[in-house]
Amino acid sequence: MWQEFKKFAVRGNVIDLAVGVIIGGAFGKIVSSLVNDIIMPLVGLILGGIDFSGLSWKVGEAEVKYGAFLQTVVDFLVIAFSIFLFVKLLNNLHERIKKQEETKQTAPTMTKEQQLLTEIRDLLKQQKETP
């Protein structure tokens, strides 16, 4: 059982996933800071000095914090757009590599007969040109 776990844990996919989760968590914090500390204050300033983090409704004793929800929605949209751009970049790179491989494969290769005939032709041209 321990050997199976070690084999599983050291596989490339699991390590890639772990790295992705760690980077994703750090990226999420960066985006949250971007939204909370830069984007939303600028949007609030444009809309007349509104602080979105403090917007809420009181319903009886409950407090509906729709301002925090709006910030979370903007946070999500920024992350989703960033992921979209990253995936689009990867797809473009993949397509470019695929096209390069296709052009390499479709490049005409000469058979031995064609190579020999080409050499004979070139030799005949040389003999014809020299007196």
From Swiss-Prot:
Keywords: Cell membrane, Ion channel, Ion transport, Membrane, Transmembrane, Transmembrane helix, Transport. PROSITE patterns: MSCL. The chain crosses the membrane at residues 8-28, 30-50, 67-87. It is found in: Cell membrane. The keyword Membrane applies. GO terms for cellular component: plasma membrane. One of its GO terms (molecular function) is mechanosensitive monoatomic ion channel activity. InterPro entries: Mechanosensitive_channel_CS, MS_channel, MSC/AndL, MscL_channel. Its main location: membrane. It holds the Pfam family MscL. It is a multi-pass membrane protein. HAMAP family: MscL (MF_00115). Belongs to the MscL family. Channel that opens in response to stretch forces in the membrane lipid bilayer. May participate in the regulation of osmotic pressure changes within the cell. Homopentamer. This is Large-conductance mechanosensitive channel. It comes from Anoxybacillus flavithermus (strain DSM 21510 / WK1).
